[in-house]
Amino acid sequence: MSYSIYKSTVNIPLSHGVVHSFCHNMNCNFMHIFKFVLDFNMKNVTEVTLFVLKGFTDNLELQTIFFFLFLAIYLFTLMGNLGLILVVIRDSQLHKPMYYFLSMLSSVDACYSSVITPNMLVDFTTKNKVISFLGCVAQVFLACSFGTTECFLLAAMAYDRYVAIYNPLLYSVSMSPRVYMPLINASYVAGILHATIHTVATFSLSFCGANEIRRVFCDIPPLLAISYSDTHTNQLLLFYFVGSIELVTILIVLISYGLILLAILKMYSAEGRRKVFSTCGAHLTGVSIYYGTILFMYVRPSSSYASDHDMIVSIFYTIVIPLLNPVIYSLRNKDVKDSMKKMFGKNQVINKVYFHTKK
C-alpha cells in the first residue's frame, strides 16, 4: 500500500517552485522519513512463513548415526519417565509427596523431550530441514513452559527433601496435600505465564528475509539474532525474567541442601550419612547441569546468541537431562527400585539392565 501511495504521489506534476519551497522550509526531512518507511514496508513484503533449522551436519552418514542415537535416547527417556509415573500410580506405598513430585518431574521431562526430539528426528531423514511459522511458535511456547516448570519443580523437590530429612516425624503434616498440591500447580502456572510473555514478545518482532535458525529446534535467542526488528526490549525481558527465575529457584535449592547438609552432620550413623550424601550429591549434580546450561543459554550478552556451541549446550537441557533425571532421582531410591522390581522383575532384560540381578 505504501509503495502504491508513493507512486501516485511522485507521478503528480509538481512545479519547481513548489518543490524548492517545500525543501527549503522542511529541509527535505519528510522525504527522508518517507523513503525510510517505504524501504521498511518493501522489506516487509518478504515476511518469513517458515524457518530453516541448521542442524548438526549435512553429512548423510553422520545424520544416520545421529538419527539412531537420538532415537535411542528418546525411547529410553520415554520408558524411564513414563515407567516411573506408572510405578508411582500403581504402588500405594509410593503415594507420598516426594514421589508425587518425582512423577510430575517425569511428566514434564517426557513432554519436554517430545517437543524437541521427534521434529529433530524427522529433520535427520529429510534434505529440507524446515519448520512452519506456527510450528515454531508452538515449539517455543511449549519448550519455554516445560523448561520453566522444571525449574520450579526442582526447587519444590529440594524443599521437600529438606522437610523429609530435617524433621521426618512431621513430614506428613508439613507436606500435606494443602502444601504440595499448590506447589505443583504454581510450578505449572508459572511455566505457562513465563512462556506466554516470551512467546508473544518474540513473535511480535518482524522476521524478514533471513530465516535460518542456528539450532536443531526453535529457540528464543537464535530467533532474536535473525529478527529485523529492534530486540533490545526482548533481550532485557529474557535477561531479567530468566535471571530472576533462576536466581530464586537456585537459592531455594542451595538453602534447602545446605540445611540438609547440617542435618546430615548431626546423624550418628555413618552408613546413614553416606547414603544421604550420595543421594544429595547425585541430585545436586543433575540440578547443576540443568541450571548451568539454562544460565549459559539465556543470561548472557546477545552478541553471542548465534554461537555454534549453543547447539551442543541446548541438547543437554532439552534431551540429555530428561534422560538422566529418572536415574538420578528414582533408580537410586530404594523404595522406587523395590517397586520397579515387583512390577518389571519378571522381564529378564529390564531385570538385568536396571537392577543387575539374575533370574
Curated annotation (Swiss-Prot):
InterPro entries, A to Z: GPCR_Rhodpsn (IPR000276), GPCR_Rhodpsn_7TM (IPR017452), Olfact_rcpt (IPR000725)
Protein keywords: Cell membrane, G-protein coupled receptor, Glycoprotein, Membrane, Olfaction, Receptor, Sensory transduction, Transducer, Transmembrane, Transmembrane helix
One of the GO biological process terms: G protein-coupled receptor signaling pathway
Compartment(s) of residence: Cell membrane
Glycan attachment points: N44
Source species, domain of life: Eukaryota
GO cellular component terms, A-Z: plasma membrane
Ranges of the Extracellular topological domain: 1-64, 115-138, 200-235, 298-310
Membrane-protein topology: Multi-pass membrane protein
Major location (coarse): membrane
Cytoplasmic membrane side: 86-93, 160-178, 257-276, 332-359
Transmembrane regions: 65-85, 94-114, 139-159, 179-199, 236-256, 277-297, 311-331
Molecular function GO labels: G protein-coupled receptor activity; odorant binding; olfactory receptor activity
Family affiliation: Belongs to the G-protein coupled receptor 1 family.
Function: Odorant receptor.
Entry protein name: Olfactory receptor 5T2
